[in-house]
């Protein structure tokens, strides 16, 4: 008998997460405690509920630039090793509680050196937190594998340095590289040196593209930079025409991405908040899924969007009528697209995801 598609049952399903920002997923209570512990005095609220409301309201701005402003407060309390370790450990624990079995969590080390830490010390603290979180989750009966992506800020000039950091830590838990931040005025091609360095070292990377900016951003990310995945990529719909009969005609860029099986790290709730789409119901996720693009479900920033993987899946189920087989496909899409070794990906798919979905499907 098929299990009903309720929120509680979706929470039971195994999940794979590719696009989650460490500084966008703190517990409100942790932000408060770290601010008090380390003397951060600029918080806009001084109780957990008020702080959660602030982050959610501020992020729901209709603009990517304004959406990013509240991160000053989370980054502000993440400037020493103990804070970074705690945030990383709690991130893993929270994901495991939502039955995420594999996650790639990203963060920008350059944003965490105001307290005097080196870039290497920042990454060391985060990776140690991830490892401790994995151990705690396993002890609780919720095994999870978490790997790290290091991100360079696209408005800064440190992308090559951060790419080198990714390579230094590639055997210690860092599996890839990314650029993030406001897209307008900061095209991916500005960071070609970093991407060429990653490619020359046989390393993987994703690029935030096609979120707040259009097709040129996606084209550069793929054609010039050689991205393995796309962060968001919602504007690819601008290269897909739908005729009066509902038939889709793909442009050359959209065709290339589908043919090459380029994964889309789609973050529905976040895209509504930033104004990339008007609503979940109008999100291009479903159109792309039906056209067999490799779409994946992601959280982006769990604190700012007041969300989880289970909540993102539920919203898609409610908007588009998906069933368990659809959620399983999106999960396997993500696992196939992870930046870990093929045999590790296959083991999680065959030994964890498929058996647990078989129980839910009945």
Curated annotation (Swiss-Prot):
Its EC number is 3.5.4.4. One of its GO terms (biological process) is purine ribonucleoside monophosphate biosynthetic process. Zn(2+) binds at residues 19, 21, 208, 300. One of its GO terms (cellular component) is cytosol. It holds the Pfam family A_deaminase. Substrate binds at residues 21, 23, 181. GO terms for molecular function: 2'-deoxyadenosine deaminase activity; adenosine deaminase activity; zinc ion binding. It catalyses: adenosine + H2O + H(+) = inosine + NH4(+); 2'-deoxyadenosine + H2O + H(+) = 2'-deoxyinosine + NH4(+). Binds 1 zinc ion per subunit. The keyword Metal-binding applies. It is an enzyme of class 3 (hydrolase). Its cofactor is Zn(2+). PANTHER family: ADENOSINE DEAMINASE. NCBIfam families: aden_deam, PRK09358.1-2. Catalyzes the hydrolytic deamination of adenosine and 2-deoxyadenosine. This is Adenosine deaminase. It comes from Mycolicibacterium vanbaalenii (strain DSM 7251 / JCM 13017 / BCRC 16820 / KCTC 9966 / NRRL B-24157 / PYR-1). The gene is add.
């Amino acid at each position: 008998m098929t299990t009903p598609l309720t929120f509680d049952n979706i929470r039971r399903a195994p999940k794979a997460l590719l696009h989650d920002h460490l500084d966008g997923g703190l517990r409100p209570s942790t932000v408060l405690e770290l601010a008090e512990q380390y003397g951060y005095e600029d918080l806009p609220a001084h109780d957990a509920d008020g702080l959660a409301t602030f982050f959610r309201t501020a992020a729901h701005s209709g603009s990517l630039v304004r959406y990013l402003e509240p991160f000053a407060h989370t980054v502000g309390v993440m400037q020493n090793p103990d804070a970074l370790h705690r945030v990383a450990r709690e991130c893993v624990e929270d994901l495991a509680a939502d039955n995420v079995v594999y996650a790639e969590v990203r963060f920008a080390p350059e944003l965490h050196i105001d307290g005097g830490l080196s870039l290497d010390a920042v990454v060391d603290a985060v990776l140690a937190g991830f490892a401790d979180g994995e151990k705690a989750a396993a002890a609780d009966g919720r095994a999870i594998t978490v790997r790290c992506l290091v991100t360079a800020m696209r408005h800064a000039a440190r992308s090559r340095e951060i790419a080198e950091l990714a390579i230094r830590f590639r055997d210690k838990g860092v599996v890839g590289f990314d650029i993030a931040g406001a897209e307008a005025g900061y095209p991916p091609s500005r960071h070609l040196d970093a991407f060429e360095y990653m490619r020359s070292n046989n390393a993987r990377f994703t690029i935030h593209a096609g979120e707040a900016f259009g097709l040129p951003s996606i084209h550069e990310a793929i054609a010039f930079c050689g991205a393995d995945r796309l962060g968001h990529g919602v504007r690819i719909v601008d290269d897909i025409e739908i005729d009066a009969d509902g038939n889709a005609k793909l442009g050359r860029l959209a065709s290339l991405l589908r043919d090459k099986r380029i994964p889309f790290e789609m973050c529905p709730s976040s895209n509504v908040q930033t104004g990339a789409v008007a609503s979940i119901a109008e999100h291009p996720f479903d159109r792309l899924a039906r056209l067999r693009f490799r779409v994946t479900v992601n959280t982006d920033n769990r604190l700012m969007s007041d969300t989880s993987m289970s909540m993102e899946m539920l919203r898609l189920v409610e908007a588009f009528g998906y069933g368990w087989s659809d959620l399983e496909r999106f999960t396997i899409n993500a696992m196939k697209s992870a930046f870990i070794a093929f045999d590790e990906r296959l083991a999680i798919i065959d030994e964890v995801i498929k058996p647990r979905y078989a129980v839910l499907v009945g």
